[in-house]
Regions:
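Conserved glycine-rich cofactor-binding loop
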Residues: 12-13
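Substrate-binding pocket helix/loop in short-chain dehydrogenase/reductase
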Residues: 86-87, 94-99, 181, 192
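C-terminal substrate-recognition "lid" of short-chain dehydrogenase/reductases
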Residues: 107, 122, 200-229
Length: 232
């Protein structure tokens, strides 16, 4: 059986890098991208430099994937940026940057991936939202709005792409164990985690487990769904 082709955005570090390693271990051929070069290598992984919000760069990346592999089985839209500012202190440039990366980038990759997946009449797309949406976190108005847009985008795309055998779902992680969260004062983090049914930070494995479910062939009747982790 041919190895599945899995494309993951935002793989330079963090959860994106973890997912690349995770799916290589599962015998996937993984293609990844980020806005800059990576300082690591992995057998079974191929990296491209691309800004997800740059349509020309995105089309060029997919042309390479089409030329080399001919098909695409999975897309994981991990790339995203956050901005934590009170609305009165948020410059317009930040608004554009967050929306371009989180919403426009997700749309462009979904659109181009679906064109490739059509050929096989099969595909799995997993997008990233955030627990900041249901938790309505203060200081994250633009970030939360962008991630809410990803949920609705996912639900509409699920309907539009169902006839092609493509499912589109979304995972919404709670705060992850990262350098950023470790710098947050303990009292503030405790208040945040107390809003979850399971009051702890998420780890990369938690996110991968949810994505694994969406990618399974047996999940062919699951589409347009959002899984928020931690019971928020």
């Amino acid at each position: 059986m041919d190895k599945p082709i899995t494309l993951i955005t935002g793989t330079r570090k963090g959860i994106g890098k973890f997912l690349a390693e995770h799916y290589v271990k599962q015998e996937h051929l993984v293609v990844g991208c980020s806005r800059s070069e990576i300082d690591w290598s992995l057998e079974g992984y191929e990296h491209y430099v691309a800004d997800v919000s740059d349509e020309v760069a995105v089309k060029r990346l997919f042309a390479e994937v089409r030329k080399k592999y001919g098909v695409l089985d999975h897309l994981i839209n991990n790339a995203g940026i956050a901005s934590m500012n009170h609305c009165l202190l948020t410059p317009l440039a930040t608004v554009h940057k967050v929306l371009d990366t989180n919403v426009v980038g997700t749309f462009l990759f979904c659109r181009e991936a679906a064109k490739l997946m059509q050929k096989k009449h099969y595909g799995r797309i997993v997008n990233f939202s955030s627990a900041a949406v249901p938790m309505k976190l203060e200081g994250e108005a633009i970030y939360a709005a962008s991630k809410a847009a990803v949920v609705l985008l996912t639900q509409v795309l699920a309907r539009e792409l169902a006839e092609f055998g493509i499912t589109v779902n979304v995972v919404g992680p709670t705060p992850l164990e990262t350098d950023l969260t470790r710098s947050v004062p303990k009292e503030k983090m405790a208040r945040l985690l107390s809003q979850q049914a399971i009051a702890r930070l998420a780890n990369f494995e938690d996110v991968a487990n949810a994505i694994d479910f969406f990618l399974k062939r047996e999940s062919n009747f699951v589409t347009g769904q959002c899984i928020y982790l931690g019971g928020v």
